[in-house]
């Protein structure tokens, strides 16, 4: 898929306007915008093909047998390597990485359906986001001159992301976890990438963390101004 392809989008608007008592008028509008927040790749941290481009090699999506064998997690077909301190203390075991990676796969709709395959370019899709915008205009009319020319003073209130005002968990934007800054996620480090390419060595992996936290989902809520509601007040004189 191309990176700009948006799977689905819904746009709707409803508006009601009325004048009353000769000198007043009110317009209320509600707009809805819903869409997935775009697409992204799921890549290896290092390059697999030896062409010098990092973070652009689409991962192989493992099956359960690749991560878990008869003896437990980390005993499957794939080889994972412990995270260790300089003193050799294990901080994130290969077995735990395999279990967490499998849970991560199961939490993503695309990955869950495509185990045992190479990830498709821009195959992962961001969660659906719905936002409502509320606009209220209050008009005050007055008339001047012999011909009773109409003048309007209009007070406006625009509530952007009105849904977030009602509930802080609504209308949030989404950001990709363990991202590379370009909308792609890089959850898997291929430690011996060059040796795999040049010598045919068996790949050795490490499952990355999301900062200091265990990586559990492809996307998480994005705490920024784009996720919060805002109010814009306006004053217009129409003549």
Give the positions of each predicted feature:
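Extracytoplasmic gating/loop element in the C-terminal half of outer-membrane beta-barrel translocons
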Residues: 21, 25-146, 154, 179-219
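Short, solvent-exposed loop/turn and secondary-structure capping segments
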Residues: 40-45, 166-173
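Transmembrane beta-strands of outer-membrane beta-barrel pores
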Residues: 18, 32-39, 140, 159-166, ...
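Catalytic cores of eukaryotic secretory-pathway lumenal/extracellular enzymes that build
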Residues: 1-2, 180
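Strand-connecting loop/turn motifs
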Residues: 7-9, 21-25, 37, 150-152, ...
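Short sequence motifs at beta-strands and strand-loop junctions characteristic
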Residues: 2-7, 124-129, 225-227
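Outer-membrane beta-barrel architecture
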Residues: 13-15, 135-137, 158, 234
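Outer-membrane beta-barrel "beta-signal"
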Residues: 226-239
């Amino acid at each position: 898929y191309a990176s700009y392809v948006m799977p689905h989008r819904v746009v709707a608007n409803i508006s009601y306007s009325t004048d009353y008592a000769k000198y007043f008028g009110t317009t209320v509008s509600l707009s809805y915008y819903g869409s997935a927040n775009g697409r992204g790749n799921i890549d290896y941290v290092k390059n697999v093909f030896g062409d010098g481009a990092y973070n652009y090699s689409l991962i192989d999506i493992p099956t359960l047998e690749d991560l878990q064998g008869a003896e437990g997690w980390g005993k499957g077909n794939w080889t994972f390597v412990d995270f260790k301190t300089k003193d050799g203390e294990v901080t994130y075991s290969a077995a735990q990485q395999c279990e967490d990676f499998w849970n991560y796969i199961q939490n993503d709709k695309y990955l869950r359906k495509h185990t045992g395959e190479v990830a498709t370019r821009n195959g992962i899709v961001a969660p659906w986001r719905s936002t409502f915008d509320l606009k209220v205009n209050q008009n005050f009319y007055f008339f001047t001159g012999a011909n009773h020319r109409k003048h309007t003073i209009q007070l406006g209130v625009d509530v952007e992301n009105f849904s977030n005002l009602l509930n802080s968990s609504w209308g949030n934007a989404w950001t990709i976890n363990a991202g590379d800054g370009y909308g792609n996620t890089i959850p898997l480090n291929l430690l011996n990438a060059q040796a795999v390419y040049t010598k045919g060595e068996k790949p050795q992996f490490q499952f990355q963390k999301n900062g200091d936290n265990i990586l559990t989902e492809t996307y998480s809520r994005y705490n920024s101004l784009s996720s919060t509601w805002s109010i814009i007040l306006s004053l217009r004189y129409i003549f």
